[in-house]
Amino acid sequence: MRPRICGRSSPRAEHSEGKIVFKDEQTQRHINENNYVAFKYVDKDGNKGGFPVNPNGSTDSIAGLTDATGRVLGLMPHPERFVRITQHPHWTRLFAKDKREGDGTTIFTNAVSYAQKNL
């Protein structure tokens, strides 16, 4: 099991063109059995769903995959576009509530922390 580098967050999906589609069931089974799924599109309760939760119709709500080492990550949402709370479409309400960084920052700070401790 790979380390969890990001909890539930809301990195932005900028478009709906990119999505995971497997060439066959054997490939999909291999990806799942080997824990290559790094991120999924889920609602606030952690449940998979259709649009708008899964904005591109990605198979099994998969948003990101890793390689066998966990060091290579392919990710469809764009956390780099949400490192400041002011980049969120509802930033004025969120900022007034808790004055925090954008959710996209979490993936980067947790990845750096993991690398510093383990690599």
Identify the residue ranges that each predicted region occupies:
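Amide-donor transfer/coupling interface in amidating biosynthetic enzymes
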Residues: M1-L119
